[in-house]
Amino acid sequence: MTTDFPAALRRGALLAALSPALAPAQAADPFNALAAVPPMAGLGTAPAPCQPADLARPLELSDVVDVALCSNPQTRLGWANARVQAAQVGVAQAAFLPTLGASASLSEVHSEATGGGARTQRRIGADLAYVLYDFGARAASLENARQLFAAAAATRDATVQNVFLAAVQAFFQRQGSVAALEASRQSEKAALESLNAAEARYRVGSATPADRLQARTAHAQAVLNRITAEGGVKAAEGALANVMGLEPTRPIALVPLPPASPGAGFEGDVTKLIETARAQRPDLAAAEAQYRAARAGIDAAQAAHLPTLSLGVGAARSQFAGQSAFDSSTIGLTVNIPLFSGYATTYKVRAAEAQAEAQAARREQVRLQVGLDVWNAYAALLTATQSVKSAADLLESATLSEAMAAGRYKAGVGSILDLLTAQTALATARQQRIQAGYNWYVARAALAQSMGALEGATLSEFGAVVPPHAPAASPPPAPSRTTP
């Protein structure tokens, strides 16, 4: 069989062109697109994946946050969505490489020229298609994919911040409910002592039946308050387990953290806080990336009606039964010029432009919401700081008043009504001091979250133990912007 040298040369050129693409075709991530999404990590395990938590010991606040970041389905969902968009970047990058296809066939050919007999034909071949130039369509699609990945990564970081705050809220809700239960038990004990004193005075004739009934009513109310507080503890335990990605029946022990006693108060320029928040809030970064993706979508839609230049290379070997095999090969350039698509391209461009306008409006909406979030959180923290001091003063005054009323009643110079009023005021003051103290923790965390800066350092302000090198939630690095 003679050799067609030009055909052999073309086949060699085909294999040479394909050889760089064949090796990474088997790789799991040839463009390192998925590598741009870091593994799920907790508060103090930035470089390493999440590790199983030790739930047998009492948990610090940082432990609760760490488990929540690693186990809450919301964080896993955000991580998976980021990987989806990272893979789409790889899909867009693949458009810059040639495509290779192979075919094989076995057929019977019937022809009158051969007396109607059947001949068996075998054929194998390979084809290469490579888009050389497309007026920026692939580049626009790649930019769109990269910006959508940036949006997904920023959305993941926003989710991390939200779960972080939810874990802080659940932690202090549980702490507050336990403290409220203890306060209700103290009030119940005081009400029982008052009831016993009223009963004793009634037996000796120095108290009226109304005094005894009032004391019984106050004690029954104290018992009811204690039962309600016990239910609040159960509800807080379930909420804490839920945010940690656990079953509500899972017992969780916490390291006690007393109510906050902040100093002079939080001082800060709210205007600068808003500016800082707009520079680092992940949801605003996501909105900006989605707008840029929409702008890239306009470029892609406009490039769809422009010509494309492609290279095509093919090689095949065919053989009829009983005959020698013969080779064939092709190489050529193809220019595809869209002439008319029924105005579909026109409306695709208009749709892309409208989408960009919508994303611009959404970006502005998020920008304004960021300012409002910071303003509300700032005001809430100022209020919480002042409430802690006022609640402490109220508790001190109510404690002295109750002690004086109890002493007067036991001495026989005070009325049961004065004592019960003082005890009710003390019970209310205890609850308000507890609530104000734990509300301050949540308000401080909420301000940090509103600025996109909720991190391990925030927990240090609460006196919580934070793992070393606990990082803030930061967007994963974007993939390289160089086209293949």
Which residues does each PLM region occupy?
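Small/polar-residue-enriched beta-strand and adjacent coil segments characteristic
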Residues: 58-60, 96-158, 268-276, 280, ...
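Bacterial Sec-pathway N-terminal export signals of envelope proteins
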Residues: 25-97, 248, 255-290, 339, ...
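Hydrophobic stripe of amphipathic alpha-helices that form coiled-coil interfaces
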Residues: 85, 92, 99, 152, ...
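Acidic, low-complexity, intrinsically disordered peripheral segments
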Residues: 3-7, 26-36, 248, 432-484
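Heptad-repeat amphipathic alpha-helical coiled-coil interaction surface used
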Residues: 77, 82-84, 89-91, 142-144, ...
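Gram-negative bacterial Sec-dependent N-terminal signal peptides
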Residues: 2-25
